[in-house]
């Protein structure tokens, strides 16, 4: 038996498989977050926390500070890192990340800091006054077990997710829907800028993007009920108007919350002619 005589090449060692996580922790490092996004691909990741303080604590660590990734991921812009410990550079061309957070007014102001940062306009907000009326905690037939309720919805959504991964959808919008979208957000932008804060402009523009994303999600749900293997599906007027109505409400909440934030932590000096 003849054996090849050569020195071992350690570069030929098998590559360790990367685990793919759909739900990731808000308590993570910047490099670890990029790894998660790279492994997840187009499926993406979801980061959820019921306390904004968790995000504040994580971003305050030296290994954290991934605020720029949150901003880029909102528009699926490329994120990357290149450290010696990682070996090859890690590049995520189109990161997909959903972020859901909740907290108090004080936590909100600490996390977003100012309107100039850009993180604020990338979020959809919903706020409400605290209900000071006591609600009965006694068990009864009318009480809904929220844990079981959302678990059942989660199972339904998981089945939908697995099937639709094999049947991607191209969502289309009619010319009349695009026209309405232009008219609606042009008017919203005009009204927002009347207040004299330029930062409101980015909020409205990104709300326009969010509105179409929401309409696309509704269309995929509609496709699931109708013909789940269709390659192309047009957004119905009902779903489009529903998405626009929701966005109108979210914009009002965003504008309300924006009044509690400064335009910038350190206002830049006014520009003037150099010569």
Locations of regions flagged by a protein language model:
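Phosphate-handling catalytic cores of nucleic-acid transaction enzymes
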Residues: 1-275
């Amino acid at each position: 038996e003849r054996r090849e005589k050569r020195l071992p090449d350690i570069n030929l060692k098998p590559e360790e498989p990367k685990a793919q996580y759909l739900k990731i922790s808000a308590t993570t490092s910047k490099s670890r977050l990029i790894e998660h996004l790279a492994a997840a691909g187009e499926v993406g990741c979801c980061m959820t926390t019921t306390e904004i303080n968790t995000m504040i604590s994580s971003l305050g660590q030296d290994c954290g500070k991934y605020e720029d990734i949150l901003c880029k991921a909102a528009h699926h812009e490329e994120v990357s890192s290149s450290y010696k410990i990682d070996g090859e550079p890690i590049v995520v061309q189109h990161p997909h990340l959903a972020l859901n957070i909740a907290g108090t007014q004080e936590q909100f102001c600490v996390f977003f800091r100012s309107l100039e940062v850009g993180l604020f306009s990338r979020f959809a907000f919903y706020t409400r006054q605290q209900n000071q009326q006591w609600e009965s905690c006694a068990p009864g037939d009318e009480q809904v077990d929220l844990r079981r309720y959302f678990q059942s919805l989660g199972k339904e959504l998981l089945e939908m997710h697995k099937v639709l991964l094999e049947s991607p959808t191209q969502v289309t919008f009619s010319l009349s829907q695009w026209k309405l979208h232009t008219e609606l957000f042009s008017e919203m932008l005009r009204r927002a800028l009347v207040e004299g804060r330029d930062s409101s402009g980015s909020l409205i523009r990104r709300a326009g993007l969010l509105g179409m994303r929401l309409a696309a999600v509704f269309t995929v749900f509609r496709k699931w009920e109708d013909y789940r293997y269709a390659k192309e599906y047009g957004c119905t007027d009902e779903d489009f108007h529903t998405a626009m109505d929701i966005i109108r409400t979210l914009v009002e909440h965003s504008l309300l919350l924006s009044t509690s934030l400064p335009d910038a932590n350190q206002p830049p000096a006014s520009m003037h002619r150099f010569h």
